[in-house]
Amino acid sequence: MSEVQALVECPVIVGAAGHVDHGKSALIEALTGKNPDRLEVERRRGMTVELGFGELALPSGKIVGLVDVPGHAHYLRAMVQGATGIDVAVLVVSAVEGVMPQTREHVHVLELLGVTHMVVALTMCDLADAEMTELAELDVDDFLSGTVFAGAPIVPVSSKTGEGIDGLLAVLDEQVSACWDACRDRVERSDAAPRLPIDRCFTIKGAGTVVTGTLHDAPVAVGDELMALPSRTVCRVRGIQVHGDTPRALPGQRVALNLVGDGVAALDRGEMLGVADRFGQTLRFMMTFTYLGREGAKPRVLESGARVHVMAGTAEVVGRIMFMEGEAPMAVGETRIVQVRLENSLPLRAGDHAVVLSYSPVMLIGGGRVLLSRCRRSRELAEGERALYVAIESGDIAGAVDAWLALQALPVTAVDIAEALDLGTGEVDAALRGLVAQGSVRKLTVGDADLLADAVVLDAAMYALAATLSAMHAAAPKETGFTPGAVAHAAWPAADEGVAAALIAEGCSRGVCASEGAEVFDPHSAAAAARVVREACERIVSLLDEAGLDAPTLPEVGEQLQLDRDTMTRALRELSLNRAIVKVERDVALSATAEAHARELVAAAIEAAGGAATTSMLREALGVSRKRAISILEHLDAVRFTVLDKEAGGLRSLR
């Protein structure tokens, strides 16, 4: 690289992997000039047992993060943790030994973690003749042909003599450039939140607690408030280093964060930093799982319920692999959708990759990609769920949103969708615009909020509303309507107040229901009930008009008209509200016409008597029994039409 070449920090991680003693650390020292073995035991043994991190300057001027992972079988866990976040793998294979057990294991891990770019460094070429080197190349090429790394460039090198190092750097530069556009897309996801799986935590005198890891999803900046899971430790970023001090780090970069906050010194590898309420942990998740069997062991099937170690990010949790109902044991090489049930919570989101190790002895047996980070505890897989997982696996965001909505019984918010599928709100909004436009998703509005529902699901909710109202009207045929709460509880027991209001409003717009005041009703059933009451009102008024002032008691009216008690009660309430009848006793009412006639008779009698009349005179004018006359006269007193003067001998006069 030219001395005047401008250096550009590139959010790409290059990771060196391979069998123990194949020269990874020596190669990294040849590439960078630094020994990645940071522990005394590593330098003494001559092999990497912990993760080594550094930086690498490429010929184009790009500076990338560099990870050296352990090659020995005993340090498989450290290898998996180090491989998390690698974008470009450098597979180190000795030209003397060729492909070895940990070579295979490391390639499998890289595949399971979603790595797609690889360069093979064929090391120790100074110790092998041309024929041996060629055979080693053929061995590597043949092995990789059955993986996603088929056709990966193979570069013979010697860390001791420097042969091939420049060529390896040039090929690495090309591979890093191939990742560059994807990295830019990753950085530009403005609605994502950062996550940092912690792989180291240590204290620096004068600075305090420092954690390191590979940053995922979104940038992090000095001053950001973060939380660690599963400990729920809250902290603030006081300083950031990425190949030096910087105010902001990008996803895909190796970062060191200087943290302040209670409990930060107790943080350790396996925890994940993120923004509170923007990431979570789970005890159950769905994943696409590939079963590899145990390297070097006799092939055997994997049974449902097998206890395993699950590794994701830098965390490791014991759990069980559960197959779907009726599925047979898995054969080596098979891939299927499984549910993973964990014994402790694991910070995870859809799209993450997980590696699965056998419980004992601890060996790599498989892994894959997380489809849903939270799921119900069931081994039954509905057809709609299969469609959801197919869409998620293929990266079809609109298809995943559509399929997930089809599984929901009630309308939801865009935030609900984003949280369930671990998507950014911008991604969800873009998908919803297309789905709403094509009619497969309907938008409902309640207050200032929008709710979304699959069109078929919404039709089913409207059918439930119609059936509910029909049943409620049938059970109470005289009721003209019901409270929204009662209707919603019967039609959609799980709906909250906002969702219920939106569904009832949708029902009103479709003519499924109607609402008036505080009541919701079936416009047809309610009309029938109202008609029964209205007809009863007309018959009651007609009878009372005909009876005049000598009206029968209300129970007698109901008996004469053969009205049931409920209809009679509702009709009398309606008539009283409309002032079509006037009660003069507890169980006696006059029609409005009869009561007006009584006023005329009483007024005429009082005027004829010179302005005041006795009860006897007024009873005679009314032409009814003394008891009924007293009831009518007391009613007229109560409504302030007349006034009784007890001191004047019980005379009544007009007010």
What kind of feature is each model-predicted range?
Residues 2-69:
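Conserved G1/Walker A P-loop phosphate-binding module
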Residues 21, 27, 46, 66-68, ...:
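Residue-level signature of catalytic and energy-coupling elements of molecular machines
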